[in-house]
């Protein structure tokens, strides 16, 4: 193994592997370091139009055509059918009530479908991470990246020369690596966050949730269940199973992401912070020492219990995985040449499927910094912008996600909260589509939009106000997709920009 590289990347997930491949294509020496090996179980699986636009951009700009192929359902299926994924036409939401089958008195009363693509050919995807991550890692290694799997980082030192020395423990003993740059792509492991000079900002986050998740075989079709319950599916813009499917429950929600290998990712996320009035229903905050269950406690929700009845857990092998509080936030700049990808610096929440896009945007930005910034002044400015963009994006998404949770008990308010997120996402998509190079995702660099979002979220968290008018009128400058239109009955077919 070479013990000197230009860039050491900690974490061999999809983002680290894509970054490594692009850096090697530019002529740099790169090592990928990870304490585990492929294949491995992972979540963070739902892509979005914004993520796929950035993926195509990375593929074109860095001569990595396989990334372009993975950016739509049809090209993925035609070029890499052996890698499992799921077709994602959009986002679907259904509000459930305890001890009742799902029902609506009128279309959209307790359901919302938001299309993210015009048809199946250009649909987004759910990533079966076990296979996707392994594929992207092998592509990077085939291009010349130094492979260091099974290496646990135990020490990082910055030398007087400005370079770094990384020491890791592996089966063969202790390994030493010297590098000019460090990029932490370790995701929720967040190796750099444990360093004494890391700046922990978790206390600034509003969102407080935990999650329990696993992969199941033989999960029933929600679309078929809706048919059995007498719902007219012809009015839907897409099959609700071809979606990031959100089932809203008391104090949280359940996700279902269906892959084309018979496996469904199922996860339950629960709000564990204070309710809008400072209390939960029984006056106490949830006891997070008691794990959530999957799927045994779905008996309270009979529609879900029926589609989960035939299901069996396939991964992780030790049983469903549960977290404590999910949220963490660390400033992503440890030093001028020691940086963290967004998904290593923050874990927020799966609600709006922001993780893949945020990770890929970070890859795109770091490639620009590492490859093109030659002098110290340019580098200082670019690194400062990198941190500023990340923190402003994180603040906005935290505001939107926490507000969505606090309004889940009122489906109209929850839907309105989601519309703010969709407006920001669509604005970003349109900017990428126009060939722009935005410094932020989700329109977080538009001061007027951010101020509107804060006002709207404040209104949504209050019990007595005309939030519908506040949001409908305030959203107008950015509402290119007809959001908040009561005539469509929560069925949005034309939000896609592909």
Pin down the residues of each PLM region.
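N-terminal FAD cofactor-binding segment of flavoenzymes
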Residues: 40-102
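C-terminal helical "tail/cap" subdomain of flavin- and related membrane-associated enzymes
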Residues: 369-498
């Amino acid at each position: 193994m070479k013990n000197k590289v230009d860039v050491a990347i900690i974490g061999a997930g999809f983002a680290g592997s894509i970054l490594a491949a692009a850096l090697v294509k530019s002529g740099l020496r790169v090592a990928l370091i990870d304490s585990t090996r492929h294949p491995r179980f992972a979540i963070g699986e739902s892509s979005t139009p914004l993520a796929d636009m950035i993926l195509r951009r990375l593929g074109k700009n860095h001569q990595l055509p396989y990334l372009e192929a993975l950016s739509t359902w049809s090209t993925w299926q035609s070029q890499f059918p052996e890698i499992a994924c799921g077709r994602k036409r959009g986002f679907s939401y259904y509000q459930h009530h305890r001890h009742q089958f799902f029902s609506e008195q009128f279309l959209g009363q307790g359901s919302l479908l938001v299309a993210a693509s015009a048809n199946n050919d250009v649909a987004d995807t759910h990533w079966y991470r076990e296979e996707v991550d392994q594929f992207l890692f092998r592509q990077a290694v085939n291009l010349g990246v130094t492979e260091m799997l099974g290496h646990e980082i135990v020490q990082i030192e910055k030398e007087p020369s400005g370079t770094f020395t990384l020491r890791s423990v592996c089966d063969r003993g202790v390994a030493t690596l010297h590098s000019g740059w460090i990029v932490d792509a370790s995701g929720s492991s967040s190796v750099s966050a444990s360093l004494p000079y890391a700046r922990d900002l978790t206390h600034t986050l509003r969102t407080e949730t935990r999650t329990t998740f696993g992969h199941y075989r033989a999960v029933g079709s929600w679309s078929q269940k809706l048919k059995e319950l007498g719902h007219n599916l012809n009015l839907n813009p897409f099959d609700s199973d071809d979606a990031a499917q959100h089932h809203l429950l008391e104090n949280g929600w359940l996700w279902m992401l269906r892959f084309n290998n018979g496996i469904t990712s199922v996860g339950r996320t629960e709000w564990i912070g204070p309710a809008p009035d400072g209390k939960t229903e029984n006056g106490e905050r949830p006891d997070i020492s008691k794990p959530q269950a999957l799927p045994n406690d779905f008996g309270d929700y009979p529609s879900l219990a029926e589609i989960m009845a035939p299901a069996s857990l396939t991964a992780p092998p030790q049983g469903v995985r549960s977290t404590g509080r999910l949220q963490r936030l660390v400033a992503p700049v440890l030093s001028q040449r020691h940086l963290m990808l967004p998904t290593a610096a923050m874990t927020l929440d799966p609600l709006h499927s922001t993780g893949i896009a945020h990770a890929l945007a970070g890859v795109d930005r770091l490639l620009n910094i590492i490859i093109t910034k030659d002098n110290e002044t340019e580098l200082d400015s670019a690194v400062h912008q990198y941190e500023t963009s990340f923190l402003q994006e994180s603040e906005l998404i935290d505001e939107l996600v926490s507000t969505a949770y606090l309004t889940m008990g009122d489906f109209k308010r929850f839907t309105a909260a989601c519309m703010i997120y969709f407006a920001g996402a669509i604005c970003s998509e349109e900017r990428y589509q126009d060939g722009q190079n935005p410094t932020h995702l989700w329109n977080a660099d538009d001061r007027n939009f951010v101020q509107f979002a804060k006002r709207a979220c404040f209104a949504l968290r209050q019990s007595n106000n005309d939030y519908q008018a506040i949001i409908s009128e305030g959203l107008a400058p950015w509402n290119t997709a007809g959001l908040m239109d009561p005539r469509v009955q929560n069925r949005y077919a034309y939000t896609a920009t592909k």
